[in-house]
Amino acid sequence: MRKSLFPLLLLLPTAAFAASPECKHSQPRSLALDLAGVKTVVFNLGQHGLLVESSAGAKPSLQGKACASDEKRLQDLQLTQEKKGDKLLVSARSDISFNSIFLGNQYAYMKLSSTLPDHINVQLKVGSGDATVIGAPILSADVGSGDVQARNIRGLVAASVGSGDIDLKDIGALQVISVGSGDLVARNVNGNTQVGSIGSGDFTLNGAKGDVRIESIGSGDAEVRDVTGNVSVGSVGSGDLNITQVRGDLELEKKGSGSLNHSGITGNVNVPRER
């Protein structure tokens, strides 16, 4: 559906603001993050944009700008934080009557950038906004219709996506709760990959050093290639499953009207017979 946006990540963080929509009226925004006793920072973004960069010894910060078509709307765009146990909940609030970035000629949004020390986990709750995460130890992303890109995540990435897009590169392990009508692309997974359900969207995995398990594929597509372990799939409905270059075994338990294509399987192949 969407092409990968990872080449954009190689640009400076400020480039994210250069590509922003119109910004007739603006104000700076910042928040001094209180990380005392915190293991995870939860960013509740809604329709806003965020870049998170984690590195050793980094000073925690959150800054950016609020943009609006009406100057009076700027006061409705605020940042808040609240501690709950060992989590810090950071919210990009929009106390306005329209929910999206644009409604006709009206718009209101924030573009934000955060730095975190590299021992703090990151959790994202994204509506129609977009987020990029680089260097976090563990990442969790719940995405609606927005976009998330992440790279250099040392540990587990847990993700779910509705109609949006998730693009991952160089991660420790992968757990996908569900893919609705959107896309999830993962490259260079250094551990096991577990996928729950794929609806009408697409799942692409290119390079995995562990085992891969997909529970179910509906009318969507799954493409898996270059896996050092085993690949097992519970069921395929009317969608397509393409498996190439697997050093271990391939197993498909149930297949409906969809298609299965496989090649380069070193181990055993156990799939339903064609009727």
Language-model-derived ranges and their functions:
Residues S238-K255:
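Short cationic/low-complexity microdomains
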Residues S4-T14:
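Sec-dependent N-terminal signal peptides
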Residues A18-V126, T132-V143, Q149-V161, D165-S178, ...:
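Acidic (Asp/Glu) and glycine-rich low-complexity loops/linkers
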Residues G207-A208, R213-S216, D221-S235, N242-Q245:
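Intrinsically disordered, low-complexity segments enriched in Gly and acidic/Ser/Thr residues
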